[in-house]
Every structure is written in C-alpha cells, then in structure tokens.
A protein has these predicted regions:
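Terminal targeting/low-complexity segments that flank the catalytic cores of oxidoreductases
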Residues: 1, 291-305
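N-terminal amphipathic/basic leader segments beginning at the initiator methionine
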Residues: 1-31
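Mg2+-dependent prenyl diphosphate-binding active-site environment of isoprenoid biosynthetic enzymes
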Residues: 30-270, 279-294
Length: 306
C-alpha cells in the first residue's frame, strides 16, 4: 500500500499552529535510548524521521479537539493512531507481504536494517500505540473504557486490519472486490475517526456519521491506490500486479472502479457535511481532505484521457 497515493506529505489539514503541535508530539512518540540495539534503534528512527502525510493523525486530532478533548489528550490519541499506522506499513513492506523497495522516498526499513529489526520496530510502534491510548483512558468511566477496547479490537484485531491483510495476500479467495479493498484501509481510518470520539464521549449519532465517513473515505483511498497500479507507479512500493494479486481495479476494470470511487466520494461528501453541521470546527480538516481525494480522482481521469 502506498501511503502517499492520495495525499502529499505537504498536505496539512490543520492550521499551522496545530500542525506544529502535532508534529512535535509525533517526533517524540518513542524515546530511542542510547543503549538500544543499533539495528532496532535505526529502524525506529528511520520511521520517525520520515513521517509521511499524517492525515489519519490529523483527523484524529481534529475530531478529538472538536468533541471536547484537551489538546494534550487529542495529541496522544493522534500519536497512537499514527503509531499503529507506522507498524502496519513496516509489516506491509516485508518480503512476505508486499516486498517493497522504498517507503516515503527512502529505502524500506527492512532493506536498510534487516527484516528482524523491521518486525521488532513494528512491534515497538504497536506497543507504544496501546500505551498512548491507555494514557488517554485514565479518567474515563468503565463503560467508555470498554467501548474503546472494543473499537481497538475491531480495528486492530483478528477481524480487523489483520484479516484484511490476510485476504489481500490470498490470491483466488472468493471475496467481494470492494470488501477486500475496504478491509485493507478502513480499519485504521475508522480507528482514527472513532477513537477520539469515544474517548470524548461523543453522542451515538455523531459516531454513526463518523463511521459512515470512515467507510466511504477508506474505500475511496484504496480505489485510488489500486488505480495507481494501473498507470504503472514507479515509487518502488510493490504493486499488486507485481505481487501476483488482483486488486479491485484489476478485478472489475478501471471504468467500474472509477464509478465506485465516485459513489464513495459522494457518500463521503454527504457524511462530512452532516458532521460539519453538528461540529462546525471540523469544516476545515474534513473538507480539505475531501477536496484532495476529489482532485486525485480528476488527475487520474486526465492521465487516462491523455
């Protein structure tokens, strides 16, 4: 999966001051001591030094602050989401998965520091992510803590991103192409939108709208990534075709994939508008990301027409 296919590294969704605060939190998310084994330390530092677009973390921060969380708590939860995302990329790039050559403009971590160091670094980010979430739950009622735990299990557990990745690695499995695509990207985006809302005690109607937005955006993002495979990406990330797998665009064809993309973007526009009516402070981040997905869709259409 290409982490930058739909958003560039410079695509800030937040205001400059808030973005600077979030970046500062993410830079110190894991303290790499001088006594840590050099290969593992190097693997973790390489990830921290190339943070990518951070759009999931930005969404988590925006939703957290809009629903009443302190900036400190919102920053911790955003850092947790980004930690889980970083772990997923480290694992996704391994030879047993996508066998990627590069990530975020650099050689993939496992190609620089070895597979073992990449796996251990991934585990470090997973554990740090859970630690950051726990720090945000200390003052929550028991029922809310249970809701957060269920969401974490749903998105990060066996039936979440792990099942999505396993199905992606199993050519010939008779899965619905859209469900297969959604299983790769929706869980982490769902967590980014719902985790801060749950910690903030947001009402059920807002959580339902955030869920709908996560599902629409998650599938749209994956379709854009799949369509990128059809126009011969050269970023070094292992494409599905190179890995012997048919993604959604490969299974149903580019025209059908674009039609489904348009449907999901329309669904996302409706969901985002409903959320903004309830929380006007979210207008900037949500509409900026929606516009960027739409712009990416139009760039693909222009490339196909050329």
């Amino acid at each position: 999966m290409n982490d930058a296919s739909a958003t560039s590294e410079s695509s800030a969704l937040l205001e400059p001051e808030d973005m600077a605060r979030l970046r500062a939190t993410l830079r110190r998310v894991i303290e790499v001591g001088a006594d840590i084994e050099p290969g593992l330390a190097g693997a973790v530092r390489q990830v921290l030094d190339a943070p990518g677009s951070l759009w999931r973390a930005q969404l988590a921060w925006a939703i957290g602050t809009a629903t009443g969380l302190s900036r400190e708590t919102a920053s911790r939860l955003a850092a947790a989401v980004e930690s889980f995302h970083n772990a997923s990329l480290l694992f996704d790039d391994l030879p047993a998965m996508d066998d990627a050559e590069t990530r975020r403009g650099r050689q993939a971590v496992h190609r620089v520091h070895g597979e073992a160091a990449a796996i251990l670094a991934g585990l470090a980010f997973v554990h740090r992510g859970y630690g950051l979430v726990l720090e945000g739950l200390e003052d929550l009622p028991t029922a809310d803590r249970r809701a957060v735990r269920r969401q974490l299990e749903a998105d990060l557990g066996l039936a979440g991103i792990l099942d999505g990745q396993a199905r992606d690695l199993s050519p010939g499995v008779a899965d619905d192409p859209a469900s297969l695509a959604a299983g790769k990207t929706v869980p982490l985006l769902r967590l980014a939108l719902l985790l801060p809302a749950l910690v903030a005690g947001a009402p059920a109607d807002l959580r339902a709208r955030l869920l709908g937005l996560a599902e629409a955006w998650g599938l749209a993002y994956q379709i854009l990534d799949d369509l990128g495979d059809l126009v011969a990406r050269t970023d070094g990330v292992g494409t599905d075709a190179e890995c012997g797998r048919l993604n959604l665009a490969g299974r149903v064809g580019a025209s059908a994939a674009v039609a489904r993309l348009d449907l999901e973007l329309a669904r996302a526009a409706v969901a985002a508008a409903e959320i903004v009516r309830q929380h006007p402070g979210l207008e900037g981040p949500l509409l900026r990301l929606q516009r960027r997905f739409v712009a990416q869709r139009h760039r693909f259409a222009l490339a196909e027409a050329a």
